[in-house]
C-alpha cells in the first residue's frame, strides 16, 4: 500500500557555490598524479592543458519516508528447538534521491555526492552549465519509486521476514540542483587524459591516467 502527496508543479532550481579556485584544483590534480597505480613519472611529465569550471545538473527528490512493518525472525537453539520472535517496526526518516540530469557518461558521474545544505538560488546564465535533459515528470516518478525502495530496504534490515508493510511518502522538495566541478585535461606522452575535481570540497571525483 502506498500513500503519497503530490509535489508542486514548479521545479525549484538551486546551486552550490564553488568553494575552491582553479589553482586549488590544479594542486589537487598534481597530488593525485603521485598516488595510486599510475606511471611513475606522471607527476614530472604530465602537462595540464585545460582547467575549467562547469556546473552539472542533478535531479534531487527529498521526502519524509514513513512505514510500518510486521514480521518475524527465527533462530534454532542448540537443543534443536526453532524459536520465532515477532516484530513490529516503525520508520519515520528523511530520504534523499539524486540522479544526474545530463549525460556525464565519460566522466562517470551518476549521483550527487553532496548532502543538502549551503545551496543558493540558481540564476540562469550566471555560470557555465551542462543543460538538463529528459522529463522532469519521469525523474520525479523514478525518485518516488527509489525512495519507496529505500524505505522497504531499511525495513527489511530490521525484520528478517516481513509479513506486512505499508509505506508512506511525503515529498518535501523536487528540484534541479547545479553542482560545480573542475574539469582538468592533461597530456602524458601522446595520450590525453581527464581528471574531475569536486568544485565545492576539492576532492578528486574520478579521472583517467596512464598505468604503470
In which residue ranges do the predicted regions lie?
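Charged, low-complexity helical/coil segments in non-catalytic cytosolic or luminal regions
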Residues: 2-192, 209-211
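Hydrophobic "anchor" residues
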Residues: 192, 203-204
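Short, acidic, Ser/Thr-enriched surface-loop or helix-capping motifs
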Residues: 198-199
Amino acid at each position: 500500500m502506498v500513500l503519497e502527496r503530490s509535489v508542486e508543479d514548479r521545479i525549484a532550481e538551486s546551486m552550490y557555490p564553488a568553494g575552491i579556485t582553479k589553482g586549488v584544483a590544479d594542486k589537487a590534480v598534481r597530488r593525485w598524479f603521485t598516488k595510486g597505480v599510475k606511471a611513475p613519472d606522471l607527476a614530472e611529465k604530465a602537462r595540464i592543458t585545460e582547467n575549467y569550471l562547469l556546473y552539472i545538473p542533478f535531479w534531487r527528490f527529498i521526502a519524509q519516508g514513513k512505514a510500518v512493518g510486521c514480521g518475524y525472525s527465527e533462530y534454532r537453539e542448540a537443543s534443536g528447538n526453532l524459536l520465532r520472535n515477532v516484530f513490529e517496526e516503525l520508520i519515520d526518516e528523511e530520504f534523499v534521491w539524486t540522479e544526474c540530469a545530463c549525460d556525464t557518461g565519460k566522466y562517470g558521474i551518476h549521483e550527487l555526492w553532496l548532502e543538502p545544505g549551503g545551496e543558493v538560488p540558481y540564476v540562469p546564465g550566471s555560470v557555465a552549465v551542462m543543460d538538463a535533459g529528459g522529463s522532469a515528470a519521469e525523474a520525479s516518478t523514478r525518485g518516488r519509486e527509489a525512495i519507496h525502495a529505500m524505505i522497504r530496504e531499511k525495513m527489511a534490515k530490521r525484520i528478517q521476514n516481513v509479513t506486512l508493510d505499508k509505506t508512506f511518502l511525503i515529498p518535501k522538495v523536487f528540484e534541479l540542483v547545479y553542482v560545480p566541478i573542475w574539469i582538468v585535461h592533461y597530456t602524458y606522452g601522446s595520450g590525453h587524459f581527464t581528471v574531475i575535481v569536486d568544485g565545492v570540497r576539492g576532492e578528486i571525483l574520478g579521472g583517467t591516467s596512464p598505468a604503470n
